[in-house]
Structures are given as structure tokens and as C-alpha cells.
Swiss-Prot record:
Claim: Metal-binding is one of the keywords in the record: yes
Main location as per UniProt: cytoplasm
Molecular function terms, GO-annotated: manganese ion binding; RNA binding; RNA-DNA hybrid ribonuclease activity
Protein name: Ribonuclease HII
Any one GO CC term of the record: ribonuclease H2 complex
Gene giving rise to this polypeptide: rnhB
Reactions that this protein is recorded to catalyse: Endonucleolytic cleavage to 5'-phosphomonoester
Amino acid sequence: MTQLIAGVDEVGRGPLVGDVVTAAVILDPAKPIAGLADSKKISEKKRLALFDIIMQNALAVCVGRASPQEIDELNILHATMLAMKRAVQGLATQPTFVRVDGNRCPNWDYASEAVVKGDSLFAEISAASIIAKVTRDAEMSELHNAHPEYGFAQHKGYPTKAHLEKLAELGPLSQYRMSFKPVQLSLMQRGGQLAGN
């Protein structure tokens, strides 16, 4: 029997806002995809093109996520592991083996290995990194459209100087991760009031 190998990667552990997004992808060995690489090392235009190619040609793709509330409750590491579990369990075709980018695998029953810099080494992890990044970036663009004053389209929720200044000025929205230090600080300075309240 052919091994069905799923690649798993996450995006969005560092941002102050939004879900942590993971993707699991099983590529079709009969349909190799040229140009797969770590999503951080390719242009947005190429990422979007590869996203469509992966969605059309992969044997199975699933996005798993953990919400800001789950991140606050569990911590970012455990929330990321939960999101990865959701991504793999949601695959329409279940894998015989799972490769996870990073240095640890979730606690699950799948045969698996963690691969540091796996998004540069294995096509299935590269594909997962592209699916996760494009998905999360699109969500940040939607949040930007709803709240352009925060500049989410530029910083994608990461704690840049410009973002921290806007957070201090405007306060956190309900989509922020309240357990993250800069968000806690902003909330304290506002007497616990979210933006718009």
C-alpha cells in the first residue's frame, strides 16, 4: 500500500490577534507541484498561485485553527497542537504518516515525526505552510477591512512598532489574545475596556 503522508504546519503563533491557523496536506505523488517552498520565502503572488494549485491537485487538504479564547485558556503552544490535531483529523483521506514542521508533534495516535525547518525540506509541509499562511493572511485582510485604523493588512497582527502604537491608542478588539502581554497592558491602561466599549 502507498504511504499517505500528511504535512502539517502552522502560522500565527506570534501575532497578538486572531486564530492560530494550521493546515494538513496530503499531496498526490502522481501530480507533483513545482515551486513548493517555505511560505515565508516566496512572494505573496506566488503563494496565492500555489495555493490554488495545491487545492486543485492535493489528495486532501484541511485547515485547523484555535481561537484567541482557546489560546488564552490553553496557552499558545497547546492551542497550536490542538489546531494541528483538528487539521489532520479533518482530512477527508486519513494519512498513514504525518510530518509536522517544528520540534514537537501533538499527542495523537498517528505515526509521525517533527522536522525542524520541515517547510524547506518536505513538499507536503511546504504545501501546508502555504495553505495556512494564505488562509490566515486573508483573515487579517478581512479584519483590516472591518477595522482599517489598526493596519492589520500591513502587520498581519504581529507586534510591530506601528501595531503596538495603535493598540495603545485604540485598545484591543475582541479578536485579540488577552493573555498576550502587550494586550494585557493595553487593557489595564484602559481599565479593562475593549475598543468600542
